[in-house]
C-alpha cells in the first residue's frame, strides 16, 4: 500500500501543471463537459424515446443539476464560469483579467464539443435508428436538437434575439447577486446549488421559444460537433441561420445584466458593520482592564 501511494504521489507530481491559467482552462473544459453531457443526455432520452422517458421538466431538472455538478467540479480551480457570457461579465466588472475571456471561451467550447461527442457515442445506435439511418436536423424525426438549440416555428429572429438577451441578462443578475459578498451572500458551499436553481427557473419559465441556450459555448460546441458528425452545414442554416443568435445575444445580455445589477443594487451596497460578537469581545476586554 505504501509503495502504491508513493507511486501515485510521484505520478501526480509529474503530471502537475504549474501554469495556473492552463489549470483553470482544464477545469472550465471539464465542468462544461459535465454540463453538456448530462444536459444533452436528458434531451436525448426525451427525443429518442418520443417522450416516454421524460419530458420538458426532466430536461430542465437535468440542466439545473448539471450546472450544479459542473460548478462543484471546477469551482475551486477556475471559478466555474462554464459560460462565456459569465466570463465576459466578470471581465467587464474587472473581477477577472481580460486574458481569461478567450482562454475560458475556448476551453468551455471544447468541453461542450466533447460532451456532445460523448452523448452521440452513448446513443449512437438509437440516433441512427430513430429516423431510419438518417441524421435529420429538424422536423418530427430531427435529432440535431438533442445537441444544440433551434427556434420554434412561431419564433422570428427579433423575438428570438430578445429571448436569448433576456434569459442571459436574468442569469447574470442572479449570478452577481449570489457571488456578491455585500448582498446577503449564499452560505459557503451552496453557491453551486443556487446557480443550478437559477438555471432551472430560467428553463421552466423561458425555455419554450428556443430552448434557452443563454450560453454561447453550450450551443456552439455541440452545434459544431453535429456539423462534423454527419448532420452537415444545415445545422448552421436552419431557422434562418439561427446559429449566431445564441452566440451574440447572450454576450449583449451579459452586459445588460451587469448594468442592471450594478445600477440598481451593486453600486448602492455598503460593507456590513462590524459584527456584534467582535464588539462584545472588545467591550468585555475593556471592562476587564478597568476592574484590574
Curated annotation (Swiss-Prot):
Aquaglyceroporins form homotetrameric transmembrane channels, with each monomer independently mediating glycerol and water transport across the plasma membrane along their osmotic gradient. Could also be permeable to urea. Also participates in cell permeability to H2O2 and H2O2-mediated signaling. In skin, transports glycerol to the epidermis and stratum corneum, where it maintains hydration, elasticity, and supports lipid biosynthesis for barrier repair. In kidney, contributes to the reabsorption of water, helping the body maintain proper fluid balance. Residues 43-56, 122-159, 207-210, 225-242 are extracellular. One of its GO terms (biological process) is glycerol transmembrane transport. Keywords: Cell membrane, Glycoprotein, Membrane, Repeat, Transmembrane, Transmembrane helix, Transport. Belongs to the MIP/aquaporin (TC 1.A.8) family. The chain crosses the membrane at residues 25-42, 57-74, 101-121, 160-177, 190-206, 243-264. Aquaporins contain two tandem repeats each containing three membrane-spanning domains and a pore-forming loop with the signature motif Asn-Pro-Ala (NPA). Residues 1-24, 75-78, 93-100, 178-189, 265-292 are cytoplasmic. The keyword Glycoprotein applies. It is a multi-pass membrane protein. A motif (NPA 1) lies at residues 83-85. The record marks 63, 212, 218 as: Selectivity filter. This is Aquaporin-3. Glycans are attached at residue 141. A motif (NPA 2) lies at residues 215-217. Pfam families: MIP. Its main location: membrane. Residues 79-92, 211-224 dip into the membrane without crossing it. InterPro entries: Aquaporin-like, Aquaporin_3, MIP, MIP/Aquaporin, MIP_CS. It comes from Bos taurus. It is found in: Cell membrane; Basolateral cell membrane. It catalyses: glycerol(in) = glycerol(out); H2O(in) = H2O(out); urea(in) = urea(out); H2O2(out) = H2O2(in). One of its GO terms (cellular component) is cytoplasm.
Amino acid at each position: 500500500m505504501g509503495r502504491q501511494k508513493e507511486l501515485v504521489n510521484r505520478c501526480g507530481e509529474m503530471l502537475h501543471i504549474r501554469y495556473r491559467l492552463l489549470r483553470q482552462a482544464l477545469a472550465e473544459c471539464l465542468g462544461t463537459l459535465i454540463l453538456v453531457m448530462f444536459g444533452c443526455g436528458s434531451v436525448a432520452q426525451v427525443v429518442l424515446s418520443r417522450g416516454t422517458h421524460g419530458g420538458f421538466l426532466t430536461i430542465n431538472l437535468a440542466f439545473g443539476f448539471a450546472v450544479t455538478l459542473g460548478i462543484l467540479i471546477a469551482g475551486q480551480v477556475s471559478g466555474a464560469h462554464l459560460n462565456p457570457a459569465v466570463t465576459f461579465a466578470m471581465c467587464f466588472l474587472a473581477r477577472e483579467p481580460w486574458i481569461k475571456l478567450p482562454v475560458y471561451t475556448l476551453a468551455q467550447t471544447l468541453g461542450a464539443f466533447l460532451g456532445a461527442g460523448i452523448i452521440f457515442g452513448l446513443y449512437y445506435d438509437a440516433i441512427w435508428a430513430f429516423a431510419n439511418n438518417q441524421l435529420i436536423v429538424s422536423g418530427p424525426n430531427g435529432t440535431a436538437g438533442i445537441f444544440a438549440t433551434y427556434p420554434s416555428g412561431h419564433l422570428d429572429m427579433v423575438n428570438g434575439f430578445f429571448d436569448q438577451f433576456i434569459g442571459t441578462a436574468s442569469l447574470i443578475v442572479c449570478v452577481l447577486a449570489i457571488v456578491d459578498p455585500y448582498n446577503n451572500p449564499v452560505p459557503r458551499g451552496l453557491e453551486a446549488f443556487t446557480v443550478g436553481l437559477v438555471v432551472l427557473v430560467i428553463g421552466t419559465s423561458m425555455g419554450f421559444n428556443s430552448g434557452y441556450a443563454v450560453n454561447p459555448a453550450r450551443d456552439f460546441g455541440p452545434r459544431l460537433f453535429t456539423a462534423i458528425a454527419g448532420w452537415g452545414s444545415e445545422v448552421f442554416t436552419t431557422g434562418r441561420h439561427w446559429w449566431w443568435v445564441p452566440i451574440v445575444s447572450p454576450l449583449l445580455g451579459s452586459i445588460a445584466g451587469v448594468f442592471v445589477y450594478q445600477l440598481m443594487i451593486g453600486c448602492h451596497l455598503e460593507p456590513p458593520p462590524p459584527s456584534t460578537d467582535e464588539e462584545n469581545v472588545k467591550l468585555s476586554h475593556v471592562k476587564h482592564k478597568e476592574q484590574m
